[in-house]
Amino acid sequence: MQIFPAIDLKNGQCVRLFQGDFSKKTVVNEDPIAQAKAFATDGATYLHIVDLDGALEGRPINLEIIQRMKKAAKIPVQVGGGIRSMAQVDYYLESGIDRVIIGSAALTNPDFLRAAVQKYGAKIVAGIDAKNGFVATRGWLDVSQVSYLDLAKRMEKVGVETIIYTDISRDGTLTGPNLEQMANLKEHVKVSLIASGGVSSRADLEALAQLGLYGAIAGKALYNHDISMSDIVEVEQIAY
């Protein structure tokens, strides 16, 4: 299972949120470039980067920093946050970013998602962020009446190959991932699934790997030292 250390960017710094709440922000490193390099040095093979400013503004805000992070880390990166037009997708991918994550727009503008997938294939990752099973958009500020499973099925139909599923109620809480919802997704869609939200321990990563998922994202637990990069490297190499 591929495990992605997460770096969330706000005002040029690495931060962690609690349940997606921008008012509950903790700065974990003032230097995101050094953080990206440190993760790679310690064995990370792919980074998950979210431009929180971009998620709020609806346009790329931190691209220059992200490019410098990728250059320092020398490993692939996937980036999300405020990517709502083909011009923005082009902008990121032409600048050397490996994959882009389309979140809110996957629900609000499905034609855009379809066009992006047709143009870029596996370089497009769809993000589903849900609260109590219902999809949230616009930096998690708005909650829709669309269920996470319905949206996943729609995404599969338009050709999406990889979906990141975030349970907002668990994000940044260290309460464990939502294994039930991940298992439900695994049963009903045949895309590569990445779990996000709530990972608190090596045991959580092992439980997700045992579901047969493609990947998992580790954030707060890494910064709190509840999970080490050596844990991540070891779990990635275990065949479940």
UniProtKB/Swiss-Prot annotation:
Protein's UniProt keywords contain Signal: no
Pathway(s) served: Amino-acid biosynthesis; L-histidine biosynthesis; L-histidine from 5-phospho-alpha-D-ribose 1-diphosphate: step 4/9
NCBIfam families: 1-(5-phosphoribosyl)-5-[(5-phosphoribosylamino)methylideneamino]imidazole-4-carboxamide isomerase
Disulfide bonds: none
Uppermost EC category: isomerase
Keywords of the record: Amino-acid biosynthesis, Cytoplasm, Histidine biosynthesis, Isomerase
The EC number(s) this enzyme carries: 5.3.1.16
Domain of life (superkingdom): Bacteria
Name this protein carries in UniProt: 1-(5-phosphoribosyl)-5-[(5-phosphoribosylamino)methylideneamino] imidazole-4-carboxamide isomerase
Compartments where found: Cytoplasm
Record-level Gene Ontology MF annotations: 1-(5-phosphoribosyl)-5-[(5-phosphoribosylamino)methylideneamino]imidazole-4-carboxamide isomerase activity
Catalytic activity: 1-(5-phospho-beta-D-ribosyl)-5-[(5-phospho-beta-D-ribosylamino)methylideneamino]imidazole-4-carboxamide = 5-[(5-phospho-1-deoxy-D-ribulos-1-ylimino)methylamino]-1-(5-phospho-beta-D-ribosyl)imidazole-4-carboxamide
GO BP terms, alphabetized: L-histidine biosynthetic process; L-tryptophan biosynthetic process
UniProt-listed InterPro entries: Aldolase_TIM, His_biosynth, HisA_bact_arch, Isoase_HisA-like, Isoase_HisA-like_bact, RibuloseP-bd_barrel
One cellular component term from this protein's GO annotations in UniProt: cytoplasm
One Pfam family matching this protein: His_biosynth
Record-linked Gene3D superfamilies: Aldolase class I
Active site: 8, 129
Similarity comment text for this entry: Belongs to the HisA/HisF family.
Taxonomic source organism: Listeria monocytogenes serotype 4b (strain F2365)
